[in-house]
UniProtKB/Swiss-Prot annotation:
Allows the formation of correctly charged Asn-tRNA(Asn) or Gln-tRNA(Gln) through the transamidation of misacylated Asp-tRNA(Asn) or Glu-tRNA(Gln) in organisms which lack either or both of asparaginyl-tRNA or glutaminyl-tRNA synthetases. The reaction takes place in the presence of glutamine and ATP through an activated phospho-Asp-tRNA(Asn) or phospho-Glu-tRNA(Gln). The gene is gatC. Transmembrane segments: none annotated. InterPro entries: Asp/Glu-ADT_sf_sub_c, GatC. It comes from Chloroflexus aurantiacus (strain ATCC 29366 / DSM 635 / J-10-fl). GO terms for molecular function: asparaginyl-tRNA synthase (glutamine-hydrolyzing) activity; ATP binding; glutaminyl-tRNA synthase (glutamine-hydrolyzing) activity. Gene3D superfamilies: Glu-tRNAGln amidotransferase C subunit, N-terminal domain. This is Aspartyl/glutamyl-tRNA(Asn/Gln) amidotransferase subunit C. Belongs to the GatC family.
Amino acid sequence: MALSEAEVRHVARLARIALSDEEIALMQAQLSAILDYIAMLQEVDVSNVPPTAQVTGLTTVWRPDVVGEMLTQEQALANAPDQQDGMFRVRAVFDE
């Protein structure tokens, strides 16, 4: 699927990316190649592949969720540049 120059410019504008004319031409070729590859992948017959299939054979890759050693409040705040009432104090993020 070949993308037009206008389509590449539109995508760049949506992404808020400024591209030169040379970059537009390069992106046009690269994005068209990617879309061609996706079209080729869509032709692969996956009718016999269960939706939940995976290839590693692993049943779980996560460790058990076990509570470990924790810092006390004093230890956690020991190196805080600013604290108040036992909590980290940071600059306001939102204006009120």
